[in-house]
């Protein structure tokens, strides 16, 4: 089974439910709302999902990775459906997939660009940990030594690569201290 084929997912479309960043700036007087798709795996799966900064420590199906508030009603200016994936940006998010027993560990260093991708990647590996260095205040080097990933991925908006590191604030994306 290929976990990443479209037919493996139930797709729910929220019609005219979303304004992106540019749409919010232009307002509904100038742009039309967009459709937004919410995908759920059709295959058996069970995930242990943890976001320490939000007090989330849950076991369940893929739906636990979605923030129900963001999908509860239309609010073009106060809600952002992309924040519905993975409860938006958090310093650390951990996944343990109980259906995959391969002993593999992936560490993802990310910005908000990866929020939509990460839950789906968690379906194909036993352990996945996500760090957003813009919010993470610990030592990434120490964290990596303790987590011992098999691979480290950096998933970020291309504009993140252009920004200089602010060594004073400890909030720059590439501040890997």
Give residue ranges: language-model regions.
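Extracellular glycan-modifying ectodomains
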Residues: 1-177
């Amino acid at each position: 089974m290929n976990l990443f084929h479209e037919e493996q997912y139930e797709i729910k479309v929220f019609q005219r439910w979303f304004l992106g960043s540019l749409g919010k700036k232009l307002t509904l007087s100038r742009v039309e709302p967009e459709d937004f798709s919410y995908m759920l795996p059709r295959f058996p799966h069970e995930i242990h999902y943890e976001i320490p900064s939000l007090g989330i420590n849950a076991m369940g199906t893929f739906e636990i990775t979605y923030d129900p508030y963001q999908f509860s009603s239309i609010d073009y200016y106060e809600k952002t459906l992309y924040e519905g994936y993975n409860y938006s940006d958090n310093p650390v998010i951990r996944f343990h997939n109980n259906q995959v027993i391969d002993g593999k560990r992936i560490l993802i260093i990310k910005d908000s660009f990866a929020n939509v991708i990460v839950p789906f990647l968690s379906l194909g590996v036993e352990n996945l940990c996500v760090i957003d260095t813009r919010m993470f205040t610990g030592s990434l080097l120490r964290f990596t030594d303790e987590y011992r990933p098999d691979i480290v991925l950096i998933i970020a908006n291309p504009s993140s690569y252009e920004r200089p590191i602010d060594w004073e604030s400890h909030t720059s994306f590439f501040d890997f201290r």
